[in-house]
Amino acid sequence: MEVTNQSNGCSNNEKESPYISSVLPGWFSEISPLWPGEAHSLKVEKILFQGKSDYQNVMVFQSSTYGKVLVLDGVIQLTERDECAYQEMITHLPLCSIPNPKKVLVIGGGDGGVLREVSRHSSVEQIDICEIDKMVVEVAKEFFPDVAVGYEDPRVNLHIGDGVAFLKNVPAGTYDAVIVDSSDPIGPAQELFEKPFFESIARALRPGGVVSTQAESIWLHMHIIEEIVANCRQIFKGSVNYAWTTVPTYPSGMIGFMLCSTEGPAVDFKNPINPIDDESGPKTIAPLKFYNSEIHQASFCLPSFAKRVIESKGK
């Protein structure tokens, strides 16, 4: 199979995006200045979809080892094999840390995976999701039905639009939890890592409300993590913690999360008080594959080099 950059749908944005991805004879490779000197490649069996939305290039391909793969602007977003490690952790780390969450907002997450996980919590009455790119939602429903199954939940309200603008219009104290499933801090997603955005989240949360946001890799992005931690400690007057999980197809094989709470009822993220089990949620959803209470607690254990840096930002 011979496929070039032009045919993978990435060429139109090459000047706009610093990512350099390609499908060469039988292989997809992802390269970025965020992880210089290395690349991650997956063998391609078949390209299933290529399209260009108003915001980005979208591609789906069948890999030989990780099932179907969703790629946005040349960056792997999820694979069928390991998406559970990300979706389950970014969702249940916050929601299992507070009693009876009722209103949840998801920023990004157009593939529907976070929605699927939120729907496991029977106490939740309202799930709002704000995704900027309608094509991502449509592609996920067509090619990743086991991920996008969350959209079938009647508690879900989908808003197509900019998450930053959406948050600015949310009445103060609306949500028990906000989950930010963002891409890397390049281009439009840069706003989702900056102080004004975190301030908007804090305003939208009730006292003792929680936020979980994608927070990069300790192996590649400590300088970004330092800034995120510093901003969060200024804004969130409850708890501020960094946790992580393993995702083989993400750069360095892991990804982190910032877990923060607003001033109010104390939140101890490291000790889940609202546990779920393998059978939680609608019958249309498969049992948990990754998350459990033990891995919840373990996810906050950091290697010494990262622990020193993160703790120093709290002084």
UniProtKB/Swiss-Prot annotation:
Task: Give the record's keywords alphabetically.
Answer: Polyamine biosynthesis, Spermidine biosynthesis, Transferase
* GO CC, one annotated term: cytosol
Give the enzyme class.
transferase
Q: Where is the active site?
A: 181 (proton acceptor)
Question: Which residue range or ranges hold the PABS domain?
Answer: 25-262
> What GO MF annotations does this protein's record show?
spermidine synthase activity
The record's similarity note reads: Belongs to the spermidine/spermine synthase family.
Name listed for the protein in its UniProt record: Spermidine synthase 1
Name the species this protein comes from. Answer: Hyoscyamus niger (Black henbane)
